[in-house]
Amino acid sequence: GGTPPKPFGMGMGIGSVTLDGVLFNQLALRPEINIGKIGIGLDLVVYMDNEGNMRDDEWDIENDPGLLLDKILFIRYGKKTDPVWVKYGSIEGLTLGYGGLMNNYSNMMEFPSVRRVGVNTGFNIGPVGGELFLSNIKDMSRGGTVTGLRAAYTVSDDLPLSIGVNFITDANMFSGLKDKDGDSYPDVFDDFPDDSTLWNDTDGDGWPDPGHGGSVLDSLVDIDADGDNIIDAEENIADINLKATPFSLKDNKASTTGLSFDIGYPVLQSDAISLMIYAEYNTLKFPAVSTSDSSFIRKERSGSGISVPGIRSTLFGILSLSLEYRMINGSYIPQFFDQAYDLNRVVTSTVDNQTIIRTKDMSVFQDYNDSTSSSGLFGSAGLNLFNLVEFSASYANMKADTTELKS
């Protein structure tokens, strides 16, 4: 179904970006080449500073052939209605089911300073469809990434009622913390974020503490690591106050899982107009987490949401409308895995010189408990003019047990 993609398309991006603390003007050409079922998207970008000097790092392919991979934005085979399809690289606008767990997710929110490499693949065999999604395979070595699965069954052509189940897990929300040198100590805790052999510098003088292992020369180690102006060799070990080993991605995990069931029926389906009615049941679970040094403590939370009835309609491929009645219990919000999920999956702040880590659930549900409940109408409208201009608006009128929330 549908028209085949054009053999060639071109996207363009102009803006400014900060790389390694320096502001650059950015010109990006993003050609898309389609041959049969294969599509390749490229990212050809030039960065110039305010004096007009081009940054060479991205084009030093002779010394770093791996840079060629950075030029590939995505590789795609087939489309989502084909018997088998797969996409590798950038993932945008990903929704599982009716979006109660994941809606409009993108792994490109911090591009190009953070390049995530995702996988989205699936199949359609007769009445059965399946889909698998990984947000960033680079996170696999850092304790885990966001993984999504969907299975759907359509009763028949005469009765196109579809039943679906969705499962999403973020195996380690902490892997959203940046760790440039890959030593498992996030940059925010790492006194040497660009050197994988070093991490602690208690007195902040640029010389590492002892205890970094045999790969660090003795001549590099700080002779007064705690900065009290007494050489450590002449001091009792008990009097040398050094930082503890920093928070590590290897030893600490904070996960979340979501499970949902949905049922939908297309009342109308044509190029001009579509109308779908549906119902969806979603759950979210956040296991309790306590790190060995108690630097991070998260209480267990869970919640659920039911959307029934739900109605979605599109007109001429330009206007999209949705309306649903939602009933929410406990620590659940619709679209927990949303477009900005990678930005707020885990956040850090500094309080009294201490770095505090909070996973998204701790920020979103800090005023909730598992007996909180609300219900009400949610509606949204979107306008898309020829894929050039997009507008969207939403309305919610949710009545809680005690208060009324309008947005």
Give each language-model segment a name:
Residues 177-240:
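Extracellular calcium-associated, cysteine-rich motifs in secreted modular proteins
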Residues 230, 238-363:
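Long, internal scaffold/assembly segments composed of regular secondary structure
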Residues 124, 252-262, 366-375, 382:
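Outer-membrane beta-barrel signature, preferentially recognizing the C-terminal barrel domain
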